[in-house]
Amino acid sequence: KILYGNGFNEIIAFESEDINKRDNFFGFWLTDWMRPFENIIEKKWYKWTIGNKNLDITHTSLDKPYCVISFKTWKKFCLETKNNLEIVNKQVVQYFPEQNYFKIITTDNKIYYAQNIYDSRSTKEKKGELLQHFFGINITVADNTFNENKLTLMHFTEEKNVLHFIYILPFSHNKALVESTVFSKDVFHSSWYRQRINDYLKRNNINTFKEQSSEKGVIPMFFAEEKRSVNSNIFNIGIRGGACKPSTGYAFSFLIKQIQLLKSSKKNYVNIHNFLERKMDKVFINFLKNNREDGKSFIKLASNLNGNEFQSFMMGESNLLTKLKIINSMPKLPFIKELFK
């Protein structure tokens, strides 16, 4: 959905959705490559929790906090800093080389030309693969309900045949995004997630709230990159370019890293995740696919790592010692079985 054409020193971004109605949040830890955007971060949390009804593990990172940027803020930033950027609310039907340019045709049969194509369209679904899917609501509640200095990264709840957790971003003492997230092969109706959110809020004595907005999404928990193009002027980016880290679902910050690396590369692709990170992700995801998991493995993992180590794991920057701690945290026999498959 992102196509760049610099033939006339312009950038055109094609987006099939009405982006004026969109206002979701991008979450990430503050890595070095995200620091150039620090001034548009909505909020930072230096503490987060991972747990269930019996146990909470609290992590702290003073130099690499968890951050969010809203889509509206990001769009405004892009439009203000890139004077030659135009966003076109159309879907691209096809594009193909024509002489020294690419000919781009949209659903209304309009034609555009570009020297380079940056393609971030959704990848093909793979049956039987795990998905991370979620639905969240932004709510306003009574004063002093939330601890705005600590986010709930994962609060696991018991659900039949799926891994489920609640994720909460407290923007203030009375405003928060509360999200229901599932790891499974099938996506559910919005009412399923709403019920889990309501149940969680009631268990925490939040019986009255005002819903301001909602958001939902689906992220593949498999390596979903498309085959690299033989044309050096076609760049697959985002999930279709292998930017997403499947085991964690983080994509936005890795897309930024991907673009930064492509700018300095002479090739039309870059490897965002190294061989060992990809191997560990594959083993971890296969473990989740083939074993009943209720979140206890995640809690054990969190208990064996400090905040900076956990952050490095989630953002694909863990060193060898942290990787060994991660492996040691996993159930030994099932994990070893997946390792040698």
Model-inferred region functions:
Residues I2, T81, L85-F209, E225:
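Predominantly flavin-linked oxidoreductase catalytic cores and closely associated redox partners
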Residues I2-N54:
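N-terminal FAD cofactor-binding segment of flavoenzymes
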Residues N9-E10, K175, N233:
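Residues at the starts of beta-strands that form the adenosine-phosphate
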Residues F14-E15, Y118, I237-G238:
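Active-site flanking residues adjacent to catalytic metal/cofactor-binding acidic residues
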Residues P36-T81:
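Conserved N-terminal/central alpha/beta ligand/cofactor-binding core
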Residues D186-K216, S232-F235, K257-L276:
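Flavin-binding catalytic cores
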Residues A224-L288:
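Conserved mid-domain beta->alpha element of the FAD-binding
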Residues Q260-K341:
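C-terminal helical "tail/cap" subdomain of flavin- and related membrane-associated enzymes
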